[in-house]
């Protein structure tokens, strides 16, 4: 197991504990409390996947954070805040395209790491384009919100979405999932292309 994956989980556990203490003192607003609840479910899922105890991970995470804070000066903190890059949100799809319900005649679903891939195997001999909404940081895809495959007529025939229980996918996870989706659609003699925005960052 990648040690960075473990240490990231440990720090996330401790930071969740700190945020929980803030909520207990009634200092958190509604979005803060909502994120707290969602992140609790996420941490339980990650802990189960990694085989790590959350209480133990929280204690180790506290030690990591305390060590960093001991070395951190106020000036360094100011510089970090000033130089931290902001992520950009890029959209291929409209809100309607993202929220539209769709149905599969021959459904196929596959989980690839932290991503769920769904496609309709009944689709044949179509020209298909992949569109996605995602955030970008440092010139790379940071977080996939949703990817969908559309026919020229606008019908949705495939989708890649993050699993709520396994957040934290990487650029490589997204690339692999796109490869699986394209392979599945091309199997039925469909022609698949990727949007220019997605090509640039994924």
UniProtKB/Swiss-Prot annotation:
Gene Ontology molecular function, alphabetical: protein serine/threonine kinase inhibitor activity; RNA binding
Entry keywords, A to Z: Eukaryotic host gene expression shutoff by virus, Host cytoplasm, Host gene expression shutoff by virus, Host mRNA suppression by virus, Host nucleus, Host-virus interaction, Inhibition of host innate immune response by virus, Inhibition of host interferon signaling pathway by virus, Inhibition of host PKR by virus, Inhibition of host pre-mRNA processing by virus, Inhibition of host RIG-I by virus, Inhibition of host RLR pathway by virus, Interferon antiviral system evasion, RNA-binding, Ubl conjugation, Viral immunoevasion
Coiled coil residues, start to end: none
Listed InterPro entries: NS1, NS1A, NS1A_effect_dom-like_sf, uS15_NS1_RNA-bd_sf
Disulfide bridge map: none
Region: RNA-binding and homodimerization, residue numbers: 1-73
Transmembrane segments: none
A GO CC term attached to the entry: host cell cytoplasm
Motif Nuclear export signal positions after renumbering to this chain: 137-146
Motif (Nuclear localization signal): 34-38
Domain of life, source organism: Viruses
Cellular location(s): Host nucleus; Host cytoplasm
Post-translational modification: Upon interferon induction, ISGylated via host HERC5; this results in the impairment of NS1 interaction with RNA targets due to its inability to form homodimers and to interact with host EIF2AK2/PKR.
Record family assignment: Belongs to the influenza A viruses NS1 family.
Subunit composition and interactions: Homodimer. Interacts with host TRIM25 (via coiled coil); this interaction specifically inhibits TRIM25 multimerization and TRIM25-mediated RIGI CARD ubiquitination. Interacts with human EIF2AK2/PKR, CPSF4, IVNS1ABP and PABPN1.
Entry function: Inhibits post-transcriptional processing of cellular pre-mRNA, by binding and inhibiting two cellular proteins that are required for the 3'-end processing of cellular pre-mRNAs: the 30 kDa cleavage and polyadenylation specificity factor/CPSF4 and the poly(A)-binding protein 2/PABPN1. In turn, unprocessed 3' end pre-mRNAs accumulate in the host nucleus and are no longer exported to the cytoplasm. Cellular protein synthesis is thereby shut off very early after virus infection.
Name under which the protein is recorded: Non-structural protein 1
Organism: Influenza A virus (strain A/Fort Monmouth/1/1947 H1N1)
Highest classification ranks of the organism: Viruses, Riboviria, Orthornavirae, Negarnaviricota, Polyploviricotina
Gene from which the chain derives: NS
């Amino acid at each position: 197991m990648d040690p960075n994956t473990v240490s990231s989980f440990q720090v996330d556990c401790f930071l969740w504990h700190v945020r929980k203490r803030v909520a207990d003192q009634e200092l958190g607003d509604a979005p803060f409390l909502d994120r707290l609840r969602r992140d609790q479910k996420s941490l339980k899922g990650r802990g189960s996947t990694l085989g790590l105890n959350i209480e133990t991970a929280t204690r180790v995470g506290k030690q990591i954070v305390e060590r960093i804070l001991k070395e951190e000066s106020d000036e360094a903190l100011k510089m970090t805040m000033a130089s931290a890059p902001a992520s950009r949100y890029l959209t291929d799809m409209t809100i309607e395209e993202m929220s539209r319900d769709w149905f599969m005649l021959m459904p196929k679903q596959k989980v690839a790491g932290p991503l769920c891939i769904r496609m309709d195997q009944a689709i044949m001999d179509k020209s298909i384009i992949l569109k996605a909404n995602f955030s970008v940081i440092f010139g790379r895809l940071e977080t996939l919100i949703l990817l969908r495959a559309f026919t020229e007529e606008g019908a949705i025939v495939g989708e890649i979405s993050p699993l709520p229980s396994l957040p934290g996918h990487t650029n490589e996870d997204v690339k692999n999932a796109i490869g699986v989706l394209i392979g599945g659609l091309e199997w039925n003699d469909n022609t698949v292309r990727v949007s220019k925005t997605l090509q640039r960052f994924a």
